[in-house]
């Protein structure tokens, strides 16, 4: 079920305040955050946000196509190393 339009998108308060401060100054800095549930809003476009994936912070450059998505969508939490290779010599 989608979020109510009257509520607006969820963005963590600390993240929103940091973005607004950087926009006022006109600076571009990497912003570290653990808030994977925050929605990307148009104010974030052009900034680099380092999103925590459970182990480290993954830097993500925000573009216009990302608006409306969640930050966590762009920082995968699992690493797939491939299925086990079949060893044909062991079968014989």
UniProtKB/Swiss-Prot annotation:
The keyword Ribonucleoprotein applies. Pfam families: Ribosomal_S19. One of its GO terms (biological process) is translation. PROSITE patterns: RIBOSOMAL_S19. Keywords: Ribonucleoprotein, Ribosomal protein, RNA-binding, rRNA-binding. GO terms for cellular component: cytoplasm; small ribosomal subunit. InterPro entries: Ribosomal_uS19, Ribosomal_uS19_bac-type, Ribosomal_uS19_CS, Ribosomal_uS19_SF. GO terms for molecular function: rRNA binding; structural constituent of ribosome. Belongs to the universal ribosomal protein uS19 family. Protein S19 forms a complex with S13 that binds strongly to the 16S ribosomal RNA. PANTHER family: RIBOSOMAL PROTEIN S19P FAMILY MEMBER, SMALL RIBOSOMAL SUBUNIT PROTEIN US19M. This is Small ribosomal subunit protein uS19. The gene is rpsS.
């Amino acid at each position: 079920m989608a979020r109510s339009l009257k509520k607006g998108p969820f963005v963590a308060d600390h993240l929103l305040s940091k973005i607004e401060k950087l926009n006022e100054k006109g600076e571009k800095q990497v912003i570290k955050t653990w808030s994977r549930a925050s929605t990307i809003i148009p104010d974030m476009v052009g900034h680099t946000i380092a999103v925590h994936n459970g182990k480290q912070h993954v830097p993500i450059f925000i573009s216009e196509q990302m608006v409306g998505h969640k930050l966590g969508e762009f920082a995968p939490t699992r690493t797939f190393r491939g299925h086990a290779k079949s060893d044909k010599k062991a079968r014989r």
